Design a protein with these regions (language model features):
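Glycine/proline-rich active-site loop of Rossmann-fold NAD(P)-dependent oxidoreductases
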Residues: 135-141, 145-147, 172-182, 205-207
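Mobile cap/lid helix-loop segments that border enzyme active or cofactor-binding sites
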Residues: 189, 196-255
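NAD(P)H-binding glycine-rich loop region in Rossmannoid oxidoreductase-like domains
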Residues: 22-86, 97-106
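Non-catalytic, hydrophobic alpha-helical segments
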Residues: 12, 54, 165-169, 184, ...
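Conserved beta-loop-beta element that borders a ligand/cofactor-binding pocket
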Residues: 87-90, 95-101, 113-136, 185
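A conserved pocket-lining segment of Rossmann-fold NAD(P)-dependent short-chain dehydrogenase/reductase
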Residues: 125-126, 139-160, 164
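N-terminal Rossmann NAD(P)H-binding glycine-rich loop of SDR-like oxidoreductase domains
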Residues: 1-24
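Glycine-rich Rossmann NAD(P)(H)-binding loop
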Residues: 152-156, 182-189, 214
Length: 255
């Protein structure tokens, strides 16, 4: 089966391509680097010709409020139109757990607009909402650092490994569309500030983490400490944080 992964050269997309190729599917990794631009529509028709499934894990290059909304709305419109023309039978999209609760952020407003466009289209679809990735914990620390101190709120947090997200997307791509939303989370629940503290300590990063209930998460002050958690019955990834952290720090210290 021919499957197109839009954003197929990035962290998640490249893993999805690899997993599905191992299952002997014909894979196309579509991205600006391979001549496919979802904003202009360039290369979409050619990439989708003969495909049965499209997996969209693309992300906006600019997270400014206007730019990110333009990216997700325009890309969704172009991708879905190209899929309709190509007769695609299953559109799989990656989104974020808690999107509807984080509408104070321009990024999450744009992700919700993307989801709404998918649901309104005629292409059968599955939206996978995932919690944050372990791989981005360092970025969270960086975005919350001022004068060498990391200030973070004690939000509940159920992150997961990128490998588990890719595995779920690959599994969904091989299955029937649910025409709805599926949630995916890690196997453990933490407080955000404590998890970042553990990550920095293991990475031998000297930054001090201060717990501050009013500190923003990616620029957004969140009053609901459960806003980043999935609902009652998510799919659960296999990788525990300690195991991922051990492997990651071992790679960092290997000459």
């Amino acid at each position: 089966m021919k499957i197109v992964v839009i954003g197929g050269t990035g962290l998640i997309g490249s893993k999805v391509v690899s997993r599905l190729r191992d299952q002997e599917h014909e894979m196309v990794a579509a991205s600006p680097a391979t001549g496919v631009d979802t904003v202009t529509g360039q290369g979409l028709a050619e990439a989708l010709a003969g495909a049965r499934v499209v997996v969209d894990v693309s992300n906006a290059p600019d997270w400014g409020d206007t730019a990110v909304m333009d990216f997700f709305q325009t890309s969704a419109r172009n991708i879905l139109a190209a899929e309709t023309a190509a007769g695609i039978g299953h559109h799989v999209a990656l989104s974020v757990v808690g999107t509807e609760r984080l509408q104070g952020s321009g990024y999450f407003r744009a992700k919700l607009a993307q989801e709404e466009a998918i649901k309104a289209a005629y292409v059968p679809s599955t939206i996978l909402r995932a919690t944050q990735f372990f791989e981005f914990i360092g970025r969270i620390a960086d975005s919350s650092t001022h004068d060498g101190t990391v200030r973070l709120p004690p939000l509940f947090f159920q992150p997961q490994a990128a490998d588990d997200v890719a595995a779920a997307l690959a599994d969904i791509a091989e299955g029937a569309p649910v025409n709805g939303t599926v949630e995916l989370a890690g196997p453990e629940r933490f407080r955000l500030d404590e998890l970042v503290r553990r990550y920095l300590r293991a990475s031998k990063d000297p930054r001090h983490v201060v717990t501050d209930a009013r500190a923003p998460y990616y620029g957004l002050e969140i009053n609901d400490e459960r806003a980043l958690l999935p609902g009652d019955h998510p799919r659960i990834g296999a990788t525990r944080f300690a195991d991922w952290l051990s492997r990651t720090t071992a790679k960092q210290t290997t000459p």
